[in-house]
Amino acid sequence: MISILPESNYAAVMAETVEPYLDSRRQEMDMPLSTGGTLHAEVYEQPDATRAVVILHGYTESAEKFREMTWYFLNEKFNVYAIDHRGHGKSVRKISDTSITHVDAFSDYLRDLEEFMSGVVLPRTEHLPRVLYAHSMGGAIGGMTLMNHPEYFARAALTAP
């Protein structure tokens, strides 16, 4: 059964328990993209994982927003793979002002996810069922990717797509 973080001392539990645990497990990577630049990812792997989840964030967000969800997934024996979409977080961007998000075409997001899946996720999760957890704009990216590549994921949860 999943133990939800308490509201009464949420900030303290995140700072004293969750963040140190995630920091000890997080592998950050910058994957080169075929179109230039890099896609930033946070990878959390554990030897006793029984499943894998790919997390796709929403517009103007980044993988960092889903650290609490990452904690829950890790406690449920998932390996976690979370990216910063292009123009977001630490990934390639065309505009230096980090308060502005820009992408030339929505298909860029789809291609980036395909490259992340083929270059990072699929080789590391051949033996695990994969789940997609995608929020808002990430849900749109995930939904279109599911249509094009149903073999990527056994299940999907799209929140506010």
Regions found by a protein language model. Give the residues of each.
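An N-terminal hydrophobic leader/cap segment in hydrolases
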Residues: M1-P32, L39-V43
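Active-site glycine-rich loops that stabilize anionic/oxyanionic intermediates
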Residues: T50, G58-E61
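Serine-hydrolase catalytic-loop signature spanning alpha/beta hydrolases and amidase-signature enzymes
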Residues: T60-E68, V80
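Conserved alpha/beta-hydrolase
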Residues: Y72-S96
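Alpha/beta-hydrolase active-site loop
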Residues: T101-L122
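Alpha/beta-hydrolase fold nucleophile elbow
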Residues: R124-S136
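Short glycine-enriched nucleophile-adjacent loop
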Residues: G139-P150
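Active-site nucleophile loop of the alpha/beta-hydrolase fold
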Residues: A157-P161
